[in-house]
A protein has these predicted regions:
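Adenine nucleotide-associated cytosolic modules
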Residues: 1-195
């Protein structure tokens, strides 16, 4: 990787809200791509039911997702600077949690929490970039997953319609595909290749 790209990737901290099927893969993709500062936020523990689509292993069952994922990421790149927070995001704490992050990847499960997070962060920070994900449930239709600029500093990855309530299941390939869109966009924004 060119030195100027490495320098750019070392200057931005990326916050990831939610470390399930989306967030765990986003973090792994960014770490492998050379992003040096990651901020991992989740309140949950790894459950055996997560293993079919999230970036965890049997040995991680019962552990905090933040701790298990941080350990994996440091095994990929021991020079990473990782901040972890084991908290549930709320309207009261979300703005403060992401204060030092230049790019925020929203990867939470609940539509209500997604909406709260987007609204809270936009109200607090006009200059931060928010990458949200919506519409990744089910299988197939890979090309339906898109990355769209919704407004200044707000991007949406997914097909915008395939939820667990309509598709009945989440699958590793579609979750990872949407996560790859989010991570690829974050990289492009950091490197100045996308506006």
């Amino acid at each position: 990787m060119a030195d100027d790209f490495k320098k750019q990737l070392a200057q931005v901290r990326v916050g990831i809200a939610g470390l399930g099927g989306l967030g765990s893969h986003i973090a792994v993709f960014l770490a492998r791509a050379g992003v040096q500062h990651l901020h991992l936020i989740d309140f949950d523990r790894v459950d055996e039911s997560n293993l079919n689509r999230q970036h965890y292993f049997l040995r991680d069952v019962g552990r905090l997702k933040t701790e298990a994922l941080a350990e994996q990421l440091l095994a990929i790149n021991s020079a990473l600077k990782i901040k972890t927070e084991n908290i549930k995001l709320t309207e009261t704490n979300a703005a403060a949690v992401f204060k030092a992050d230049g790019i925020i990847c929203e990867a939470v499960d609940s539509p209500e929490t997604k909406a709260m997070l987007v609204n809270t962060l936009f109200a607090a920070y006009a200059d931060k970039t928010l990458i949200a994900c919506s519409g990744l449930a089910g299988t197939g239709r890979s090309n339906a997953i898109k990355t769209r600029c919704i407004s200044k500093n707000f991007y949406l990855c997914g097909d915008g319609e395939s939820g667990i309530e309509t598709c009945g299941q989440l699958s590793a390939p579609r979750a990872a595909l949407c996560a790859a869109h989010a991570a690829n966009l974050a990289l492009a924004l950091i490197l100045g290749l996308e506006e």
